[in-house]
Amino acid sequence: MARKSLIQRDKKRKKLEQKYHLIRRSSKQEIHKVSLLSEKREFYVKLQSSPRNSAPTRLRRRCFVTGRPRANYRDFELSGHILREMVEACLLPGAIRSSW
């Protein structure tokens, strides 16, 4: 199980990313539209003035049961071993173990 402080930090980052999403996206679009270097610089300053943790690259996908940051399946938002346990216990409808 991941430390609770790391899970809370990621939740805080997710809130910040959602709050500044439109601002960051619009300033990035304006950077690509504008051809003058001085105007581009203004939009870069606006982009850099937003908090560092509001960037989507700072987010880490975590298992919502254990908080484990690695080996996560996007479709289920679960880590590999929890996914396997839940499939074996028939807790995920439609998911079956492969056999060949």
UniProtKB/Swiss-Prot annotation:
Pfam families: Ribosomal_S14. This is Small ribosomal subunit protein uS14c. It comes from the Eukaryota. GO terms for molecular function: rRNA binding; structural constituent of ribosome. Belongs to the universal ribosomal protein uS14 family. Gene3D superfamilies: 1.10.287.1480. InterPro entries: Ribosomal_uS14, Ribosomal_uS14_bac/plastid, Ribosomal_uS14_CS. Binds 16S rRNA, required for the assembly of 30S particles. Keywords: Plastid, Ribonucleoprotein, Ribosomal protein, RNA-binding, rRNA-binding. Disulfide bonds: none annotated. It is found in: Plastid. One of its GO terms (cellular component) is plastid. Part of the 30S ribosomal subunit. One of its GO terms (biological process) is translation.
